[in-house]
Amino acid sequence: MLPALPHRNFGLFCMSYSFSSSSRSLGLGLAALLLLALPACRQSGATIESGERRAPDDSTSLRIACPLTAESLPFYYAVRSGICDSLGLPLRVKTYFAQFDADTALLGRTVDGGVTDHYRAAYYRSRGRMRNFDEFIALNGSWSLLAGGRLRIRELRNLKGRTVGMARYANSDHYITRLRDSLRLKSDDLFFAQVNSFKIRHLMLENEQIDCAVLPEPYASRAVANGNVRLSSALPSEMRMSLYMNQRALRNKRHNAQAQLLRKAYNLAVVAINKGRSPYLDSVLVKDYQVPAAQLSAIRLPHYDATH
């Protein structure tokens, strides 16, 4: 009798076999085949892919659209660290640099859920969209208003007449509007430049194409590391984001079970992330979030709360 294989999610191929002494060579051959098949048996099919890539439709996996912000980080960690594989969760994380593009996927039929902010969700619902979605996991993040390092902007009162990169009908829009009103500036005292992509918004700030930018982590920390100035950090309560699940997916027995496994994967991921830097976390930041290795120590991530 071969010893039990060290993982429970192997499918029909990964079974125990018994052999008589007269068929020892055959048994060894089958054992070798089992060992060769072991990596495939262990995989749940969890993947990370570009949202722009047209992947074949896969109704057997749980598909979520994620913008590359700190709020989505636990989902990437759960895939890269093998947490999803250990739970047998075939999670497909579709990656987007702009919230608008992630929302387009969420509102379509190519994913089962996605990450967006509460202002955008309210905006869509006011227009008769996103009414068939449930808030499934409340997420943690961190957002800041940054000013170009070469400009003489060191305080919020220096913002008059400046151009700020943000996105309309989103938490960044709400945040900079609240700051403008608190400074008693007129609507034409501050110029809003709509830049949906977080990556491009960050690059425009670095290249002095805009004076300021509202950026999520890890882009904000990268900007500070490059000499730009953090003028203000938003309160968590005003930049709330969540994973929303389509009710159609939750009514499906398979996807509902996968969604419950996703909660477990998320909780395991946040426990690990909250402990600080690790090879898996560094890998996610470098490979998925495109953080230069030299800036890893400068990244300031939020504390992540477990979901229930």
What does each of the following model-derived ranges do?
Residues L5-L30:
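Bacterial N-terminal signal peptides that target proteins for export
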Residues Y119, F192-A193, S197-D288:
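Pocket-lining segment of extracytoplasmic ligand-binding domains
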Residues E49-S50, D57-L62, L73, C212, ...:
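An extracytoplasmic/periplasmic, membrane-proximal ligand-sensing/linker region
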Residues R42-G45:
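Bacterial signal peptide processing site
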Residues T47-K186, F192-Q194, M204, D211-E217, ...:
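Short, glycine-/small- and polar/acidic-enriched structural segments
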Residues R150-R157, R180-S182, D188-F191, H202, ...:
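Proline/Glycine/Serine-rich low-complexity intrinsically disordered segments
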Residues A37-A40:
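C-terminal motif of bacterial Sec signal peptides marking the signal peptidase cleavage site
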